[in-house]
Each structure stands twice: as C-alpha cells, then as structure tokens.
Amino acid sequence: MSRAPLLIAAALVTAAAAPAAAQNWTSNWRTIAFKTVSGGTDVDRINVRGSYRYREVRLCVFNAPLAMRDFDVRFENNQRQDVRVRQRIRAGTCTRNIDLSGNRRDIEWIRLKYSPIRRGGTRPLVRVQAR
C-alpha cells in the first residue's frame, strides 16, 4: 500500500522535469567562455577558444548583478561588432539574444564594459553563450 503513493509521486516528478530538460536541449545555447570580472576596472576581456561559427550570442551573469554598459565582439577576421546593452543584469539572468552581423561568425574575444563594482562585494561571473 505505501509503495503506490511513492511510485505515483516519482512518476509525477519525472514527468514535470522532462519538459524543462527538453527546453534546455532544444535551445542549443553553448557556453563558449566565462570569466569572473575583476571589479578593479570597468573593462574586462574574455577570450574565446576554438574556431566555431555562431549566429547569436548572449551574456549570462551569475553570483551578483552587473550593470552592463556594452560589449564589443571581435571576430577572427579582425572585424568587430559593438553591442549596446545599458541594463543592470540580475544574477541568474542573461542579456537579450544578439544576432551577429554577417554570416556565421568565429568569435575571438569579447570586451565587457560595465559600471564599477563595489569593493568587498561578490564579483559576478559572466558566461558567454552562443549558438
């Protein structure tokens, strides 16, 4: 008798978790680089390894909020794309999806420009995601 409610609860938990896992898989976002921002300056550079081509990019912030002004994307062919953000990104959230100009692009590095971070506070971790 006591096993039936346990089995039903396990089935419900499994069914509820399945759509979330499927959503993550179909979004195709890959974390291609990350960095904990220095906080001592208002500019940081994130190098991206490999030679993959992407259509879109977004930045996700963890551990603490970050007041992002903008970021520059530098491609392997030395072209650049300046992206204005001008928003406070809360911990656990991402910027809007940014279409990369031109055909599918190979990213070399991204330079972040943000408002200074208070000393002694938790420094944000920024993840670069692309697809």
Language model region names:
Residues 52-59, 102-119:
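Noncatalytic modules at the cell exterior or secretory-pathway interfaces
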Residues 62-85, 124-130:
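Short, surface-exposed beta-strand/strand-loop-strand elements in extracellular ectodomains
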Residues 36-68:
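Short, surface-exposed binding/anchoring microloops in extracellular/periplasmic proteins
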Residues 1-8:
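Bacterial N-terminal signal peptides that target proteins for export
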Residues 31-35, 82-90:
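Solvent-exposed serine/threonine-rich low-complexity stretches and specific carbohydrate-binding patches
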Residues 8-15:
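Bacterial N-terminal signal peptides
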